[in-house]
Amino acid sequence: MDETDKEVDDSIHSNILYYENRELELLKNAMNIEAKKRGERIAQNPIMKQIINVLEKFIRDKKLVCYGGTAINNILPESEQFYKRNLEIPDYDFFSSNAINDAKELADIYFRQGFSDVEAKAGVHYGTYKVFVNFFQIADITQLDSKLFSSLKKNALLKDGMLYSPPNFLRMAMYLELSRPGGDITRWEKVFKRLNILNRHYPLKATNCDPETFKHSLSARSYNKQFQNEKEKIQTIIKNIASKEKLVFIGGYANILYSRYLHNNERAYLEEIPDFDLLSNTPDKTAKAIKESLEKQDIRNITIETKAAIPDYLSTHFEVRVGSQPVAYVYKPLACHSYNSIKVKGKIFRVATIDTMMSFYLLFLYADRPYYNPRRTLCLCEYLFKIQQKNRLKQTGLLRRFSITCYGKQKTIEDIRNEKAKQYKRLKTKKKSKEYHRWFLRYNPELNPENKPFIVQSKTREDIINEAKLALEAKILTSKAVIEGIDDIQKIDKLKKKNIVPTPSPMSPIRSRSSFSRVKTNKLNNRKNISARLSMRTPKTRKNKQVENLLFVEDNFTPSNM
């Protein structure tokens, strides 16, 4: 092949790639347009509006606390909101101190008001319960430690009668996500944008953070003669253990290292912090190692106290004291947290990234523990935030952000499913126990005897049509239904040869009842098959028979012409 032929081939190849890329752009554009239309159809559906109104009233009446993307969205000015209510249904996540009962109560409310296909069930994550109405997931209710729930409720933002998690807690959740490179990093861009918007409208501000005030506060809090006399020796011993065991500093010494990026007057405050906060995969052993090493250096009156966990947020941790003075807090990481390594006087130290430190400190604000001083902790957060903002593009040393090196075990979906499988084997003979329901709740309000008077409900034809439209949209939005629809299309030829009418695909027009009369096979069996395919629930879940009949009556009733 000469050079001319090669140039021609390259040109042809370039043209092919150009047209393929243009076609891909057209495809994406069409998908976006259809997704927008579909979202608007669902959001504007009168039945869906009723469903959301019932949910919001429930959240208000029960004084539950919203969190997550919808919470961030709803506390922002309308011009900055990233969810448009006329185009998307709000995806409410909220905390409860009694999540399983609240999920069942919400399901009962929907059932008693005549909504179809209502169910409450356990989510993938233990302690989270989902409520479904009309084939749509409407709410995620998450169990929260009672003290933490009370603290969030006390500090919550009230808007339109609904409680939203305080901005610092919402901020904490986003810093936590950005500090876990072993987690779902595909969400990082979205989370980062939302964090920046929240920081603009709800700045991280603290009061009375002058170094002199805090110097006195620290001294009054825990003055100990032995500690003051042997402070340097104690700190050197702990630093040596941390370096040797490759632990991660998340406070105390980490703050001192970060203080080099502050002004001199601010730096003086951070240098006065007397204790260490460490991440260790074996915190009990680390606490004992610190105690033994201190005792070898003739430091006496050392105690270790076990501190209770905050489920899903903070592990059981250990406080090491010299007399009355805490010298170290050792935590087991619940995820894989990012850190950077630096060399100081010939020793390698692992220091948490600012994102990791912020995720811990902002949680401490609401932990309601006497050993966390909220005012001092908030000041630390403000200083760290300032450092990060002033050095946001520097990616060296301690300032490297979004580090891929992390410490701890990150749970995967597979880990969670394996844990649920183990729990099922353990509890499968105790299906009526409370523990089984906490893990595997599947609540159908129709089976609740108290709901029997509400089973018969009269509905207008308009309500029936709107429910049918929602049912169709739900089928299309479900990936399983789409896959089944594709399988149906591929099987059409084979089914025609056998003179069997295929089950309607959720992607194809639904035919009238008369078109089924010509089928030689048993009509009753076909109808059972279709009903089963339209159902997204267990056989015991109530179906709206009027909706199912309508799906046979309406000709050419497809999502595209709703």
Regions found by a protein language model. Name each.
Residues 8-15, 135, 324, 346:
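Residue-level detection of beta-strand-connecting loop/turn positions
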Residues 54-59, 106-114, 237-242, 290-298:
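Hydrophobic, Leu/Ile/Phe/Ala-enriched alpha-helical segments that form helix-helix packing faces
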Residues 59, 138-222, 326-478, 485-488:
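Active-site and adjacent loop segments of nucleotide-processing enzymes
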Residues 1-50, 158-232, 470, 474-511, ...:
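N-terminal regions immediately upstream of nucleotidyltransferase
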Residues 1, 63-71, 75-76, 85-88, ...:
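Compositionally biased low-complexity segments enriched in polar/charged residues
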Residues 48-100, 233-284:
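Active-site nucleotide-donor binding segment shared across nucleotidyl transfer reactions
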Residues 109-150, 293-338:
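Conserved catalytic core of two-metal-ion nucleotidyltransferases
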Residues 100-106, 284-289:
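Short, conserved charged micro-motifs
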